[in-house]
Protein backbone atom coordinates (compact mmCIF):
# COMPACT_ATOMS: atom_id res chain seq x y z
CA UNK A 1 0.00 0.00 0.00
CA UNK A 2 1.44 3.37 -0.97
CA UNK A 3 1.28 6.38 1.29
CA UNK A 4 -0.83 9.26 0.08
CA UNK A 5 1.15 12.35 -0.74
CA UNK A 6 -0.06 15.45 1.08
CA UNK A 7 -0.99 18.37 -1.13
CA UNK A 8 1.19 21.46 -1.07
CA UNK A 9 0.54 23.48 2.12
CA UNK A 10 0.79 26.72 0.14
CA UNK A 11 -1.70 25.59 -2.48
CA UNK A 12 -4.05 24.30 0.20
CA UNK A 13 -3.85 27.56 2.13
CA UNK A 14 -4.53 29.66 -0.97
CA UNK A 15 -7.44 27.41 -1.90
CA UNK A 16 -8.89 27.78 1.61
CA UNK A 17 -8.55 31.58 1.35
CA UNK A 18 -10.44 31.66 -1.96
CA UNK A 19 -13.14 29.25 -0.76
CA UNK A 20 -13.58 31.29 2.42
CA UNK A 21 -14.40 34.41 0.42
CA UNK A 22 -16.69 32.36 -1.82
CA UNK A 23 -18.50 30.99 1.26
CA UNK A 24 -18.92 34.51 2.63
CA UNK A 25 -20.34 35.68 -0.70
CA UNK A 26 -22.72 32.75 -1.10
CA UNK A 27 -24.11 32.78 2.44
CA UNK A 28 -23.78 36.38 3.64
CA UNK A 29 -22.34 38.70 1.01
CA UNK A 30 -25.40 39.05 -1.17
CA UNK A 31 -27.84 39.60 1.69
CA UNK A 32 -27.90 43.27 2.63
CA UNK A 33 -31.64 43.81 3.13
CA UNK A 34 -32.95 44.21 6.64
CA UNK A 35 -36.41 42.82 7.34
CA UNK A 36 -39.03 45.01 9.02
CA UNK A 37 -41.96 43.37 10.78
CA UNK A 38 -45.01 45.36 9.65
CA UNK A 39 -46.92 44.66 12.86
CA UNK A 40 -44.22 45.62 15.37
CA UNK A 41 -41.76 47.65 13.33
CA UNK A 42 -38.91 45.49 14.62
CA UNK A 43 -35.93 45.37 12.29
CA UNK A 44 -33.97 42.13 11.91
CA UNK A 45 -31.26 40.85 9.66
CA UNK A 46 -29.81 41.05 7.23
CA UNK A 47 -28.77 37.48 8.04
CA UNK A 48 -31.02 34.64 9.11
CA UNK A 49 -29.95 31.84 11.44
CA UNK A 50 -29.94 29.11 8.75
CA UNK A 51 -27.57 31.02 6.48
CA UNK A 52 -25.19 31.83 9.35
CA UNK A 53 -25.20 28.21 10.54
CA UNK A 54 -24.50 26.97 7.01
CA UNK A 55 -21.66 29.48 6.63
CA UNK A 56 -20.12 28.43 9.95
CA UNK A 57 -20.27 24.75 8.97
CA UNK A 58 -18.52 25.48 5.67
CA UNK A 59 -15.86 27.58 7.43
CA UNK A 60 -15.30 24.76 9.95
CA UNK A 61 -14.87 22.28 7.09
CA UNK A 62 -12.35 24.62 5.46
CA UNK A 63 -10.35 24.78 8.70
CA UNK A 64 -10.34 20.97 8.86
CA UNK A 65 -9.11 20.68 5.27
CA UNK A 66 -6.46 23.33 5.88
CA UNK A 67 -5.32 21.77 9.14
CA UNK A 68 -4.85 18.36 7.54
CA UNK A 69 -2.38 19.63 4.97
CA UNK A 70 -0.94 22.93 6.24
CA UNK A 71 0.30 24.31 9.55
CA UNK A 72 -2.54 24.83 12.01
CA UNK A 73 -1.91 28.56 12.30
CA UNK A 74 -2.07 28.92 8.50
CA UNK A 75 -5.38 27.06 8.32
CA UNK A 76 -6.95 29.23 11.01
CA UNK A 77 -5.67 32.48 9.53
CA UNK A 78 -6.65 31.40 6.00
CA UNK A 79 -10.26 31.39 7.16
CA UNK A 80 -10.34 34.17 9.77
CA UNK A 81 -8.53 36.94 7.90
CA UNK A 82 -10.25 36.81 4.48
CA UNK A 83 -13.67 36.21 6.04
CA UNK A 84 -13.21 39.21 8.33
CA UNK A 85 -11.91 41.33 5.45
CA UNK A 86 -14.87 40.46 3.22
CA UNK A 87 -17.34 41.11 6.03
CA UNK A 88 -15.64 44.39 6.95
CA UNK A 89 -15.60 45.78 3.41
CA UNK A 90 -19.35 45.27 3.11
CA UNK A 91 -20.14 46.45 6.63
CA UNK A 92 -18.07 49.62 6.28
CA UNK A 93 -19.83 50.49 3.03
CA UNK A 94 -23.31 50.12 4.51
CA UNK A 95 -22.87 51.45 8.08
CA UNK A 96 -23.02 55.14 8.93
CA UNK A 97 -22.67 54.68 12.70
CA UNK A 98 -19.07 53.47 12.74
CA UNK A 99 -20.04 50.33 14.63
CA UNK A 100 -18.74 48.24 11.73
CA UNK A 101 -15.30 48.45 13.40
CA UNK A 102 -16.64 46.79 16.56
CA UNK A 103 -18.37 44.17 14.44
CA UNK A 104 -15.18 43.54 12.48
CA UNK A 105 -13.22 42.98 15.68
CA UNK A 106 -15.87 40.58 16.96
CA UNK A 107 -15.96 38.70 13.64
CA UNK A 108 -12.16 38.39 13.69
CA UNK A 109 -12.06 37.20 17.30
CA UNK A 110 -14.93 34.76 16.71
CA UNK A 111 -13.41 33.25 13.59
CA UNK A 112 -10.00 32.99 15.24
CA UNK A 113 -11.45 31.34 18.35
CA UNK A 114 -13.75 29.01 16.43
CA UNK A 115 -11.05 28.13 13.93
CA UNK A 116 -8.58 27.40 16.71
CA UNK A 117 -11.01 25.02 18.41
CA UNK A 118 -11.80 23.23 15.13
CA UNK A 119 -8.10 22.96 14.27
CA UNK A 120 -7.23 21.63 17.73
CA UNK A 121 -9.94 18.97 17.56
CA UNK A 122 -8.80 18.07 14.05
CA UNK A 123 -5.19 17.60 15.22
CA UNK A 124 -6.30 15.41 18.16
CA UNK A 125 -8.40 13.21 15.89
CA UNK A 126 -5.58 13.04 13.34
CA UNK A 127 -3.05 11.96 16.00
CA UNK A 128 -5.40 9.31 17.40
CA UNK A 129 -6.03 7.89 13.94
CA UNK A 130 -2.30 7.83 13.21
CA UNK A 131 -1.58 6.10 16.53
CA UNK A 132 -4.28 3.51 15.85
CA UNK A 133 -2.99 2.79 12.37
CA UNK A 134 0.58 2.22 13.62
CA UNK A 135 -0.53 -0.13 16.40
CA UNK A 136 -3.05 -2.10 14.32
CA UNK A 137 -2.02 -5.68 13.45
What do these predicted regions represent?
Residues 9-25:
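Alpha-helical transmembrane segments
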Residues 50-72:
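Canonical alpha-helical transmembrane segments
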Residues 28, 66, 90, 118-126:
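Membrane-water interface at transmembrane helix exits
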Residues 9-13, 75, 99, 103, ...:
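Residue-level signature of transmembrane alpha-helical entry/exit and packing/kink sites
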Residues 96-130, 136:
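Alpha-helical membrane-associated segments of multi-pass integral membrane proteins
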Residues 1-6:
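Short, Lys/Arg-rich, polar N-terminal cytosolic tail immediately upstream
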Residues 74-85:
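Central hydrophobic cores of alpha-helical transmembrane segments
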Residues 22-54, 85-109:
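Membrane interfacial helix motifs at helix-loop boundaries and amphipathic/re-entrant anchors
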Amino acid sequence: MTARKKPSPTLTTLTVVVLTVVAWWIFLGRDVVRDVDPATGNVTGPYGAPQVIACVLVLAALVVVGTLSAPTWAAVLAVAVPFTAAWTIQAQATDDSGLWAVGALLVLLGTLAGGTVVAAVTRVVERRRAARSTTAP
